[in-house]
From Swiss-Prot:
Residues 522-565 are cytoplasmic. It holds the Pfam family Fusion_gly. Residues 142-170, 466-491 form a coiled coil. Gene3D superfamilies: 1.10.287.2480, Head and neck region of the ectodomain of NDV fusion glycoprotein, Newcastle disease virus like domain. GO terms for biological process: fusion of virus membrane with host plasma membrane; symbiont entry into host cell. It comes from Sendai virus (strain Ohita). Disulfide bonds join C70-C199, C338-C347, C362-C370, C394-C399, C401-C424. In natural infection, inactive F0 is matured into F1 and F2 outside the cell by one or more trypsin-like, arginine-specific endoprotease secreted by the bronchial epithelial cells. One identified protease that may be involved in this process is tryptase Clara. Unlike most paramyxoviruses, Sendai F0 processing occurs on the cell surface and induces a conformational change in the protein that unmasks the fusion peptide. F0 maturation is a primary determinant for organ tropism and pathogenicity. N-glycosylated; glycans consist of a mixture of high mannose-type oligosaccharides and of complex-type oligosaccharides. Glycosylation at Asn-245 is essential for membrane localization and F0 cleavage. InterPro entries: Fusion_F0_Paramyxovir. This is Fusion glycoprotein F0. The gene is F. The chain crosses the membrane at residues 501-521. The lineage of its organism: Viruses, Riboviria, Orthornavirae, Negarnaviricota, Haploviricotina.
């Protein structure tokens, strides 16, 4: 059975590695670095959904049953010191409870208003009676009251026992740790010293130990004693929580070793003071330990961008600050509510965000879809660390190499230049000198002719990309419109031109003038002929517009008849 479980664990680990490798292969980091986009290797994602609860009951004053009152004066002075620390904390807790408790206006038979606790606070959220801070505090206080009976029993038992540490469980299985860190010292050191060294010497040793304990108490729990809100527990406090052995966390919390490292590294184990007992000098803390769940096959990459040159102009690619990639998804990541450890991002919910399609294709290596903006000032970064070396825009910057400050001349066909320990040990960019890592290496992707997407203004990514897409559409439409106009201009060019129309108009005017002149000439000619023959006789040989009518059967018969008459 054990062998089978080990095999299953090995297969699961192998699948996790394969998924992580596939996800990391989605983003061509070397290719993007050639246009100034720097993407790191990425970290895994863990969701902190639920938490485990623990309670710590600190007994700050040891139980002393010494003969002749040895050490009583030192204990009184120590209690006075504790009062100055604990009284403000107790008053703040009383104020918190007074603010959270909501008075019910419903009167009882004795006309005395009843007091309701946590449920009334939750019920009045919509009415704005309780603030969110009060609700949060109310939840913690309600949980404390649920465990109050168990904690009270532990307090009672602590006053009757001489054990320094007791680990119990309440009714719901939550652990309650009772700490009496001074009790072992009293039992093992002070009591034997009374018979050997005398009462005065033993009292002095007790006073020194009480002072030392107060200092250690402030070191371990000082941040928690300074407020009634949640504060991260220190490693010293965690050690006391797990019986002075922090490795026991692995066995008492239902989580893995990597998760424990993450919550400790990010200080996500929170402690809240929920009770102060000035009679017994006991302080109760509620401890919440988050339970992490890793999302398989997901990486969150940190992305940044520097300027690069293309065709003699300086440009800048707009990318989201964080990229989330999984096998079937590539988008942005909102890590505002997340915390970052060395190996992972811990988030309260899935931080995935949608990004435009053009930006997805850009991140996947299609540089023609990358949204860019033209650089007009020096605010845009000019260099960044990548693969242990430096990637820099040495056309827009002054770059030097080596201890001799040799100037670097960047090929104008390349967007950026890669500088490593092998080709340039001491790197200088605009007067800033940097030493490259000896393990750094050059980018493996060959430089090609770079083409980029539309130019946009630097503003929220989604708006800019939509504007850029609209600009592309308008430009394409304008080009098609010009083609259509050109085609139309080729159709019927000889009569659609302006010169042709003018020529036609001139010809028509000339023809009209000629006709008018001919009519005038004919009219004047006829008039002159009539004036030259006043009797109305017109010679036969003279040309006239009147028709000469002759009979078709006789030759001159009509004229003869006319002469007889």
């Amino acid at each position: 059975m054990a062998t089978y479980i080990q095999r299953v664990q090995c297969i699961s680990a192998l699948l996790s590695v394969v998924l992580t490798t596939l996800v990391s292969c989605q983003i061509p980091r070397d290719r993007l670095s050639n246009i100034g986009v720097i993407v790191d290797e990425g970290k895994s994602l863990k969701i902190a959904g639920s938490h485990e609860s623990r309670y710590i009951v600190l007994s700050l004053v040891p139980g002393i049953d010494l003969e002749n009152g040895c050490g009583t004066a030192q204990v009184i002075q120590y209690k006075s010191l504790l009062n100055r620390l604990l009284i403000p904390l107790r008053d703040a807790l009383d104020l918190q409870e007074a603010l959270i408790t909501v008075t019910n206006d419903t009167m009882t038979g004795a006309d005395v208003p009843q007091s309701r606790f946590f449920g009334a606070v939750i019920g009045t959220i919509a009415l704005g009676v309780a603030t969110s801070a009060q609700i949060t505090a109310g939840i913690a206080l309600a949980e404390a009251r649920e465990a109050k009976r168990d904690i009270a029993l532990i307090k009672e038992s602590m006053t009757k026992t001489h054990k320094s540490i007791e680990l119990l469980q309440n009714a719901v299985g939550e652990q309650i740790l009772a700490l009496k860190t001074l009790q072992d010292f009293v039992n093992d050191e002070i009591k034997p010293a009374i018979s050997e060294l005398g009462c005065e010497t033993a009292a002095l040793r007790l006073g020194i130990k009480l002072t030392q304990h107060y200092s250690e108490l402030l070191t371990a729990f000082g941040s928690n004693f300074g407020t009634i809100g949640e504060k991260s527990l220190t490693l010293q406090a965690l050690s006391s929580l797990y019986s002075a052995n922090i490795t026991e966390i692995m066995t008492t919390i239902r989580t893995g070793q990597s998760n424990i490292y993450d919550v400790i590294y990010t200080e996500q184990i929170k402690g809240t003071v929920i009770d102060v007992d000035l009679e017994r000098y006991m302080v109760t803390l509620s401890v919440k330990i988050p339970i992490l769940s890793e999302v398989p096959g997901v990486l969150i990459h940190k992305a940044s961008s520097i300027s690069y040159n293309i065709d003699g102009e300086e440009w800048y690619v707009t990318v989201p600050s964080h990229i989330l990639s999984r096998a079937s998804f590539l988008g942005g990541a909102n890590i505002a509510d997340c915390v970052e450890s060395r190996l992972t991002y811990i988030c309260p919910r899935d931080p995935a965000q949608l990004i435009p399609d053009s930006q997805q294709k850009c991140i996947l290596g299609d540089t023609t879809r990358c949204p860019v903006t033209k650089v007009v000032d020096n605010i845009i970064p000019k260099f960044a660390f990548v693969n242990g070396g430096v990637v820099a825009n040495c056309i827009a910057s002054t770059c030097t190499c080596g201890t001799g400050r040799r100037p670097i001349s960047q090929d104008r066909s390349k967007g950026v230049v890669f500088l490593t320990h092998d080709n340039c040990g001491l790197i200088g960019v605009n007067g800033i000198e940097l030493y490259a890592n000896r393990k750094g290496h050059d980018a493996t992707w060959g430089v090609q002719n770079l083409t980029v997407g539309p130019a946009i203004a630097i503003r929220p990514v989604d708006i800019s990309l939509n504007l850029a897409a609209a600009t592309d559409f308008l430009q394409d439409s304008r080009a098609e419109l010009e083609k259509a106009r050109k085609i139309l201009s080729e159709v019927g060019r000889w009569y659609n031109s302006g010169a042709t129309l003018i020529t036609i108009i001139v010809v028509m005017i000339v023809v009209l003038v000629v006709i008018i002149v001919i009519v005038i000439v004919l009219y004047r000619l006829r008039r002159s002929m009539l004036m030259s023959n006043p009797a109305g006789r017109i010679s036969r040989d003279t040309y006239t517009l009147e028709p000469k009518i002759r009979h078709m059967y006789t030759n001159g018969g009509f004229d003869a008849m006319t002469e007889k008459r």
